[in-house]
């Protein structure tokens, strides 16, 4: 499974492939904890975050702390 995360100031839009599942979480402490727990349980092959002027840094740190495979990419 692969995970793509669209990062914005207040929220993270999360998309799982190939299942097509999508959900959103707040970009705050409780939201990041819930996201890390949910993704850890799913054991993705890779989580890809959009680089968005620094908003992605706390997200990347939380997911890395959960030992999730992670890539931060520039938006197209």
List PLM regions with ranges.
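Phosphate- and other anionic-substrate recognition elements at nucleic-acid/protein interfaces
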Residues: 1-76
């Amino acid at each position: 499974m692969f995970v793509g995360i669209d990062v914005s100031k207040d929220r993270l839009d999360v998309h799982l492939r190939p299942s097509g599942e999508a959900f959103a979480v707040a970009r705050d402490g409780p939201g990041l904890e819930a996201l890390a727990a949910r993704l850890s349980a799913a054991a993705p092959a890779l989580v890809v975050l959009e680089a968005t002027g620094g908003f992605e840094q706390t997200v990347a740190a939380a997911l890395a702390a959960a030992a999730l495979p992670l890539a931060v990419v520039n938006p197209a």
